[in-house]
């Protein structure tokens, strides 16, 4: 008798997510902007309304990914700070402590796959818009989509790299240095 297959952590099944509502909203915003761009003019005859709705969905996707989904699904967050005195701008990356928080393999897989696939789809649509030469307005909308999606992709990639580097560094050096310092200080205090 065949046994039903059990879903394994890491599969692309939203039911395995540690945060299913966050994941569904994340995927919903990611796909809705693309779908509105592709099929909006078929259902809504007003070009300006389709343009504005697509732009609003892109903005919602950017905000939700940057401020909510990244933090809840993979424990990463980023923002840009500007020094008001000098006008210099720099990115700040934050990651959750791997010792206190476990990231669901399913959430992680959905997050990174969607993060890299979405800009690739928008690049394909940009090439299509250039080849068709139908309207510069459509190309401008794709350019806005590319700026927003690539910004999040680059920022989260850097944030993940920063997170991995600090985790490896703390594992390699943290335990030994802290133990040596604490042992040396306590040894001196109680001699």
Curated annotation (Swiss-Prot):
Swiss-Prot/TrEMBL GO biological process terms: protein secretion; vesicle-mediated transport
Pfam families (UniProt xref): DUF846 (PF05832)
Bilayer topology term: Multi-pass membrane protein
Membrane-crossing segments per the record: 16-36, 38-58, 110-130, 136-156
Coiled coil segments of this chain: none
Keywords: Golgi apparatus, Membrane, Transmembrane, Transmembrane helix
Xref: InterPro entries: TVP23-like
A GO CC term attached to the entry: Golgi membrane
Places the protein is found: Golgi apparatus membrane
Main location as per UniProt: Golgi
Its biological purpose: Golgi membrane protein involved in vesicular trafficking.
Family: Belongs to the TVP23 family.
Protein known as: Golgi apparatus membrane protein tvp23
Organism lineage string: Eukaryota, Fungi, Dikarya, Ascomycota, Pezizomycotina
């Amino acid at each position: 008798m065949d046994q039903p297959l059990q879903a394994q952590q890491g599969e692309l099944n939203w039911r395995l997510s540690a945060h299913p509502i966050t994941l569904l909203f994340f995927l919903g915003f990611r796909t809705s902007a693309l779908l509105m761009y592709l099929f909006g003019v078929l259902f809504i005859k007003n070009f300006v309304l389709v343009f504005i709705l697509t732009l609003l969905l892109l903005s919602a996707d950017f905000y939700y990914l940057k401020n909510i989904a990244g933090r809840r699904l993979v424990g990463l967050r980023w923002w840009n700070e500007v020094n008001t005195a000098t006008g210099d701008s720099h990115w700040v990356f934050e990651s959750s402590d791997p010792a206190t928080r476990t990231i669901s393999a399913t959430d992680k897989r959905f997050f990174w796959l969607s993060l890299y696939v979405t800009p690739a789809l928008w690049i394909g649509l940009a090439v299509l818009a250039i080849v068709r030469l139908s309207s510069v307005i459509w190309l401008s909308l794709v350019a806005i989509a590319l700026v927003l999606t690539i910004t999040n992709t680059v920022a989260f990639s850097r944030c993940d790299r920063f997170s991995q580097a600090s985790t490896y560094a703390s594992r390699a050096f943290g335990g030994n240095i802290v133990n040596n310092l604490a042992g040396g200080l306590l040894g001196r205090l109680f001699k």
